[in-house]
């Protein structure tokens, strides 16, 4: 049988231990340590009496650490170390991370590894269905960095660290005369290489224009955009593809679950959390260490065969 050398096994005698029980645990743990190469430590299930303490002192041995219970704890089972992410990453990036890791839930954490929320595959797919709200990109306070990354584009004018936080998203499919009636201040306009359309969008005080199909932008347009405070981004995608992809640039913080999160501690007992897990529709549950920091994830599957502690 292959021994998992990363797991610690506690060797314990009977309750209310006498000298035989304590000494047997010490000897057997030492024997297993030598013969198997695994980590075996002696334990005791009760107080050390005076006779046993005399024997231990005589041979210069420390008393085994008392084990209050041998019930399996969360730290005794396999915890999936799903890496936490920043809450401002895009939906597209979160989706790609899930696919690469083969998971359906990703935790959002702070730089200090404090859990802030959970985003699931279901949350991401539901976000794609919200196609009728043309202002959702600004409501989500989407950073231009995310937009550039999602559209595989480049920023010509503006600061990619800034946020699109006011206005709607629209496609400039009509001629400039018609555009004047539906472009409003702060809007994000997706358009092509037509000089007149770019000029009209900037003059109508659009907050950002996205020029598609890798089209060049004239110096006149760049200068005017700079003067009017209009961000200019280029993308190799056509207008249809850019319009479909842009909602994937929204931060996961707008869709992730942040309230009433069900978490468990590494010291929680499996018997205590089974009922909670069974009563919830969640597939994955975050695990926190004794300092309240994010440790990893477990699911019902992890509870099928937890290893005994002794």
What are these regions (language model features)?
Residues 41, 65-66, 106-107, 188-191, ...:
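Short hydrophobic alpha-helical runs that function as membrane-insertion/retention elements
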Residues 51-52, 216-223:
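Short, glycine/polar-rich helix-capping loops at beta-to-alpha or helix-loop-helix junctions
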Residues 103, 114-130, 237, 286, ...:
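Short beta->alpha transition motifs characteristic of CBS
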């Amino acid at each position: 049988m292959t021994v998992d050398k990363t797991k610690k096994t506690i060797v314990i005698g009977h309750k209310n231990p006498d000298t035989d029980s304590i000494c047997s645990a010490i000897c057997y743990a030492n024997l297993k340590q030598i013969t198997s190469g695994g980590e075996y430590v002696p334990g005791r299930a009760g107080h050390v009496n005076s006779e046993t303490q005399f024997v231990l002192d005589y041979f210069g041995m420390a008393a085994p650490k008392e084990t209050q219970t041998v019930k399996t704890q969360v730290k005794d089972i396999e915890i999936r170390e799903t890496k936490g992410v920043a809450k401002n990453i895009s939906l597209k990036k979160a989706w790609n991370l899930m696919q690469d890791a083969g998971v359906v839930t990703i935790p959002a954490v702070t730089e200090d590894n404090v859990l802030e929320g959970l985003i699931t595959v279901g949350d991401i797919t539901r976000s794609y269905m919200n196609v009728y709200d043309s202002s959702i990109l600004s409501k989500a306070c989407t950073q231009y960095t995310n937009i550039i990354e999602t559209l595989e584009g480049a920023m010509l004018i503006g600061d990619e660290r800034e946020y699109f936080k006011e206005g709607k998203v629209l496609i400039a499919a009509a001629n400039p005369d018609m555009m004047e009636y539906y472009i409003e201040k702060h809007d994000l306009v997706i358009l092509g290489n037509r000089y007149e359309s770019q000029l009209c969008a900037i003059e109508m005080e659009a907050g950002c224009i996205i020029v598609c199909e890798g089209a060049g932008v004239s110096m006149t347009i760049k200068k005017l955009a700079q003067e009017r405070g209009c961000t200019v981004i280029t993308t190799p995608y056509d207008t249809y593809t850019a319009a479909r992809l842009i909602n994937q640039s929204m931060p996961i913080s707008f869709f992730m679950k942040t309230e009433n999160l069900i978490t468990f501690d590494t010291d929680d007992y499996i018997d205590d959390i089974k009922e909670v897990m069974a009563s919830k529709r969640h597939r994955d549950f975050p695990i926190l260490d004794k300092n309240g920091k994010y440790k990893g994830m477990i699911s019902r599957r992890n509870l099928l065969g937890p290893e005994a502690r002794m």
